[in-house]
Amino acid sequence: MASVKLPWDLEEEILSRLPPRSLVRFRTVCKHWNGLFSDKRFVKKHLVRARPQFIFLTESKKMYSIEIDLGGTIEVREVPYDFHCQPMKKNFTTIMACDGLLFRDFWKQGVAVWNPWLRQVGWIEYEDKGFRFCGVGYDSCKPDKCYKILGYFNCTRRLSDSLQEGYYQAAIYECASQAFKFIDTPNPFNLWPNKDPLSVNGNLYWLAHNHPETLEYFIETFDFSMEIFKPFCLLPCRKDFGSNELVLAVFKEDRFSLLKQCFETTKIEIWVTKMKIDREEEVVWIKFMTLPTTNLPNLDDTYCCSSYFIFDKTIIMCCGDYKTGATCIYMVRGDMFKKIQINSGIFQFSYCVYLPNLISVPFESHQV
């Protein structure tokens, strides 16, 4: 029986639905398939269909991906890596996602840029080792994506012959030019978050509150195009200072979702923004759902920051169980509730939500 050759359009459609770990194995099967990895249109099409997962950076210096099936099962994979160095102190190691790539900060050493599924690792090393990493973005107004790192230096200034004070000097490290650019702004990090910021469409966003003036919660942003800090929008719970636990997340790639848990009742509300965040319009929040209070943890009591994402009307939350010290995944959709404890000895100290993808590392890289 003669083999049947599928139309190329149909082949491509099938391949775009496969996870990156499967596609990577197929690179040697067919030159045409291998060419898809450098096809920007296909890479974007594949990314749109990606299901979010958690990437963990652990105390044992191992990294894991946590893939969640909506039926209520999870798959934990150790992710191989080969970085230039190891962290000096675990508390100064951060991992965050920016447009499909992972950026891992090594305090006083540099930043690794990584796609775990393509097994590519790049390295950014700045000459001044006193630069403290805060987040990654780029100028979205330019056609070419040139990454920039926002951070700061700990500085001192003399007030008199016998008195001096410390202050933060904000700066941007431009990866293309390998140069620092200082930002002239007073007290830039007064509103800096205790949770890692989100990188969306080139800019950084995080939760802040105006305390003690108005007690309003809002989203602060750093705009890499204008190179300024500025408020983005108020939150729907803007007057409830001190009575809620708030967690900000990305919704549908270009919108925000906000999880609000009341300290007293542990009731959880999920809000989402109506429009894309890059539109020049007033931000409108819509209540997306209310979650039951009996089974979900009190997020204020968890031993590390909680994180979550929404996929196919399912809330998937990750946090550490304060009593057992274990990492737990919670899944809520309609009447369905599942709590899954990860029993592989993972005690995380840094993690983020990540979309598996085929985006190549733009910096000098090597295969892991």
Swiss-Prot record:
Task: Enumerate the Gene3D superfamilies for this protein.
Answer: 1.20.1280.50
Which InterPro entries does the record match to this protein? A_thaliana_F-box (IPR050233), F-box-assoc_dom_typ1 (IPR006527), F-box-assoc_interact_dom (IPR017451), F-box-like_dom_sf (IPR036047), F-box_dom (IPR001810)
The lineage, from the top, is: Eukaryota, Viridiplantae, Streptophyta, Embryophyta, Tracheophyta
**Which Pfam families does the UniProt entry name for this protein?**
F-box, FBA_1
Q: Which PROSITE patterns match?
A: FBOX
NCBIfam families from the xrefs? F_box_assoc_1
Q: Which segments constitute the F-box domain? A: 1-46
Q: Which SUPFAM superfamilies match?
A: F-box domain
Organism this protein belongs to: Arabidopsis thaliana
Superkingdom of origin organism: Eukaryota
CDD domains linked to this entry: F-box_AtFBW1-like
**What name goes with this protein?**
F-box protein At3g17710
Please name every pair of cysteines joined by a disulfide bond in this record: none
